[in-house]
From Swiss-Prot:
Protein name per Swiss-Prot or TrEMBL: Protein-lysine methyltransferase METTL21C
Region (Disordered) residue spans: 1-40
Biological function: Protein-lysine N-methyltransferase using S-adenosyl-L-methionine as methyl donor. Mono-di and trimethylates 'Lys-943' of AARS1.
Chief location bin: nucleus
Taxonomic path: Eukaryota, Metazoa, Chordata, Craniata, Vertebrata
Family annotation (InterPro entries): Methyltransf_16 (IPR019410), SAM-dependent_MTases_sf (IPR029063)
Family: Belongs to the methyltransferase superfamily. METTL21 family.
Amino acid sequence: MDACLSSEQQPRPLDEGPSPPDNEALHTDGTSKRPGDSNEIEASLRSLQKFVPTNYASYTQEYYRFVGKKIVIQESIESYGAVVWPGAMALCQYLEEHTEELNLRGAKILEIGAGPGLVSIVASILGAQVTATDLPDVLGNLQYNLLKNTLNCTTYLPEVKELVWGEGLEQSFPKSTLYYDYVLASDVVYHHYFLDKLLATMVYLCQPGTVLLWANKFRFSTDYEFLDKFKQVFDTTLLAESQESSIKLFKGILKWD
């Protein structure tokens, strides 16, 4: 494992992820409080009808374990947005191991590029109020996975919202009424043409006091170019990394003039 190359504190090594779960049933006892408002549950269930998953030819059921819970994720290799990537595993591990330090219980969290939803599910299990966002074609599968793993067993039901990077931000996420303690992102940086819009979206969603946690497997030169631009607008700390898997986890605090 590497030592910290540029961060303000010594990063911790990232494990390869949790061991595969056994065959015990999904926990439903969850946190100390369950959603008591039936209207909230009904609203979340109704929202499921708004999102129709892409008609992939095949899905698989993948199993993960975090926070002592068995998490079942429906995935498909036919879409980047329907697969759990290594950065998501690293970010889940960090949230699990630093729950008290991060003060996640009751925290308002937005995840950028939530994909099949593993990070948002773990954050919800840890007691956060989560808004999971992604492109329209993956929202149905995302909502399915969130409800399957959080309904009746987390303090707050996560919300699903469409977010196209750089588009309609003020209309969909008005700063006057919405504030997030944390913005989470994992493996959103790879070889695509929307990196500038991604960075603009990260900047927009962060207000004074917001902490951005970004985990990514670094594969391409464009990943490092994005990191350079990220550091220009965020005070950046390397929290953890794995030399073997090329995964890095950063904390970003938006710079204010």
